[in-house]
Amino acid sequence: MGVLLYERDTNLTIQGINSIENFGLIGIFILEPAEPVPPLSKEDLQFEQFQTIYMFKIKENLDRLQANQPPASLLELVKDIQSHYGVLDHKLNFAQNLRSSADFVYKHSISVAILSALIANQMRIPDQEKAALITASLLYDFGYLYVPQSVLDKGDDLTDSDRDFIQMNLERGYETLRPQYETFQLPKPSLEIIQQAVFRNSKTLKIKEPVENIKLLADILIAADKFDHLTAMNINKAPISEVAAMAEMKKQRGAYNPLVLAALAPVSYT
């Protein structure tokens, strides 16, 4: 799932070793005293810690949903992300962890949820709608869990049939969530946002235009999704800079809401 990075001269403890198993990590890195490292602020360190904890929590919740069980701590995770990143009034140093095909769904979902919270705060979205957006951001890629590893391992080298297959499974993920949404006491607007995000590329179903506030929330999710795909570190694909990502998205006229891109800019780069 990734690595756990400790500061210089950290003593390795039994608890640290157990973290490898508990969090599904590849390993633990401890920097040597002479190892050059850029200064990390308290916020940077906190962000790294939160990413690891959040990833563990979203994996647990998505695994439960896949087994048709109610999520254990999803709403708690939403509240935590909202309390930390839905109120942030400055740029976040968005340090990315390396992703593989085995863990990208979890890491991508967490990054998109945080980005969505940052954008929503810039746009002064009400708290209730912000929570619905964060929930949708954590769940909209649920269908990727049905995609075989052999397809995910291709990265961007997908055939048209691969893309159609992935789209089919994203729609399957939505249809799996839909009948149990109220039972699981998840925000109803979240399901509408997920529907807009999932079915916008569907060849089988044309969805109706949503009400204005749902459309805006879906636009935020779609922009955050693309921005993270472009800037994330993947084993199969090198990332591009945040500035280059913004430039590429602005060039695709009509694909992304200009108001959303204007709100993304101050929280994504200086």
List each model region and its residues:
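Histidine/acidic-rich helix-loop-helix segments that form or flank divalent-metal centers
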Residues: 10, 137, 178-222, 236-240, ...
